[in-house]
A protein has these predicted regions:
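C-terminal-of-GTPase-core extension/linker across diverse P-loop GTPases
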Residues: 1-166
Length: 166
């Protein structure tokens, strides 16, 4: 089944294998069984709609469960140069951008890799930590230091919106 699919030029990920079938081919470490984040760099005129090449890419990978980010790298490079947030916001408004494509790229990457972020806050610093989605607090604490998981006592948790509100 996999061989035929590959010979047709298709990625294994689009085959929709069962867990049993996936474990049977796991030792092969097939790259086409991995999710892919495609990034299409388009010209400024196509930054909101894409172009024929990005449309063809989207069409080609639509059944794979992968994602395509369409962006204009020249504009993104200019956005990255701004130090003043107001200037950055004005520039983005001029191009009718809600957020930089780099932010979408980061969010899509986290989603694709099944990652999440949690924050720790102390007197001197606030820090972001990357963890796998679904981890419990003790596992998340192990990212800071392995001993933290072993001696874990409690976590004070607050939703982001509540944190901003209160």
């Amino acid at each position: 089944q996999c061989k035929k699919h590959l010979e047709e030029g298709k990625n294994i990920i689009s085959l929709g294998l069962s867990k049993e079938d996936k474990s049977a081919i796991a030792d092969l470490f097939l790259l086409t069984d991995k999710h892919i984040l495609y990034v299409a760099n388009v010209d400024e005129a196509s930054m909101h709609t894409g172009n024929k090449y990005s449309a063809a890419l989207i069409e080609a990978v639509k059944n794979e469960g992968n994602e395509v980010i369409v962006m204009t790298n020249a504009i993104e490079a200019q956005i990255a140069e701004f130090e003043n947030p107001e200037d950055k916001a004005m520039f983005m408004e001029e191009y009718k951008m809600v957020e930089p494509a780099l932010d979408r790229l980061i969010h899509s990457t986290y989603k694709l890799l099944n990652l999440s972020t949690y924050f720790t806050a102390g007197v001197q610093e606030v820090r972001a930590w990357t963890i796998e989605k679904g981890w419990k607090a003790p596992q998340a604490a192990s990212v800071i230091h392995t001993d933290f998981e072993k001696g874990f006592i409690k976590a004070e948790v607050i939703a982001y919106d509540d944190f901003l509100k209160y």
